A protein has these predicted regions:
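Adenine nucleotide-associated cytosolic modules
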Residues: 1-179
Length: 179
């Protein structure tokens, strides 16, 4: 309601459901860009596989304690999440935000950068973070940019989109391709 008051031309769709393999394709189909703030690896891989299949860019943001990261995964123009993280780390190395703690302002910093990257994609402005990772370290108040290249062993690509089976993922988050 607040957004409609600010700009009546903006349509907001809400989904009161958990994103899973049974609904993800219907929910994300037709969007120009997806903003990802998922806090777990199975959801990130599920979103990656669906967005790769549909050719939709994803503005990814993640946080951990005092650090954050933002990247744009564009299946038609650059690397994807599976290129950056082919396999999830062991559970003991990836505690939840509740277990590890997160600096309270960090989601706002990362979210603001994601909003900027989303606008850059939608308006075709500037140089987006496709093929790059922006790392934020709030303990040093430093920002670093790293290059990200496609992993030649990654089989979840837009070229293979007809073989990608979007499924709920187990703890291994292994890709599902039909033969």
């Amino acid at each position: 309601q607040t957004i409609a008051k600010l700009n009546p031309d903006v349509k907001v769709n809400t989904y009161d459901t958990r994103l899973d393999a049974s609904n993800i394709m219907d929910i994300i189909a037709g969007y120009d860009v997806i903003v990802d703030g998922a806090d777990n690896f199975p959801s990130r891989y599920l979103l990656n596989d669906a967005s790769v299949k549909l050719g939709i860019p994803v503005v990814h943001g993640s946080i951990f304690r005092f650090e954050g990261m933002v990247s744009v995964f564009h299946p038609l123009r650059g690397p994807t999440y599976r290129d950056m993280v082919p396999e999830p780390p062991p559970a003991e190395l990836a505690p939840s935000c509740a277990e590890a703690g997160v600096l309270g302002v960090l989601p706002g910093i990362v979210g603001s950068i994601q909003a900027l990257e989303t606008l850059k994609i939608l308006l075709d402005l500037g140089d987006s973070l496709i093929g790059r990772i922006l790392s934020v370290d709030t303990t040093e108040m430093s920002f670093r940019v790293f290059k990200l290249r496609a992993d030649p062993s990654n089989v979840v690509t837009h070229e293979n989109r007809d073989r990608i089976e979007v499924r709920d993922l187990d703890g291994l988050c292994a890709p599902w391709l039909s033969h």
